[in-house]
Amino acid sequence: MSKFLQQKPIILASSSTIRHKLMKSLGLDFLVVPSNCNEEEIKTRHNSVELVELGITLAKIKALDVSQHYPEHYIIAADQLCVADKRVFNKPLNHQTAVSHLRELSGKQHQQIACLCIVKESKILWQYHETATLTLHHLSEKTIEAYLQAEKPYQSCGAYQYEGLGKWLFKEVQGSEDTILGLPLMPLVNALVNLKVVGI
């Protein structure tokens, strides 16, 4: 960490390489300790709640899970929901599901909802959500197949990697890139300063 910033111990409770890169861009020192919670089981149990509430709940559960083992650290956790017509598009995990997701989203508007929280000693200190709205071009079968072969975005909600070639799939985007990628940086920076986790 540079001399410009003074900080308390921080953990990012995420296995996402993109969130890791976004955090690194802030110049912070932090540990990466992914949560062991079962996201799919939690989503099934909370399938009747509002989608934003579901995202916040998932972020909180991840942070609280890690906080039990690291009480001295401030835990940052996040969750990302890709939503169209009140349906959540989870990580496709395989090629055929990714094809299906892009077919369904083709030519339509959908939302990427980024949910964040900060926890210390199993207490929730801050929570936040931000939404980006994206509209895909009408995608041909050939385009879908070629894109998926190029990036294999099977671990990405919505079956695209916006940080890479995925940008070419869209005709309109409203919202910040870091929100689309799952870690809205300015709200997080302000929260860390306000909570005195980071000083300048």
UniProtKB/Swiss-Prot annotation:
Q: Which reaction does it catalyse?
A: a ribonucleoside 5'-triphosphate + H2O = a ribonucleoside 5'-phosphate + diphosphate + H(+); a 2'-deoxyribonucleoside 5'-triphosphate + H2O = a 2'-deoxyribonucleoside 5'-phosphate + diphosphate + H(+)
Q: What is its main location?
A: cytoplasm
**Keyword terms, alphabetized:** Cytoplasm, Hydrolase, Nucleotide metabolism
What GO molecular function terms would the record report? nucleoside triphosphate diphosphatase activity
Recorded superkingdom: Bacteria
Q: What is its EC number?
A: 3.6.1.9
Tell me, which GO biological process terms does this entry list?
nucleotide metabolic process
**Which residues constitute the catalytic centre?**
79 (proton acceptor)
- Function in brief: Nucleoside triphosphate pyrophosphatase. May have a dual role in cell division arrest and in preventing the incorporation of modified nucleotides into cellular nucleic acids.
Concerning NCBIfam families, the annotation shows: maf (TIGR00172)
- Protein family according to the UniProt entry: Belongs to the Maf family.
Q: What is this protein called?
A: Nucleoside triphosphate pyrophosphatase
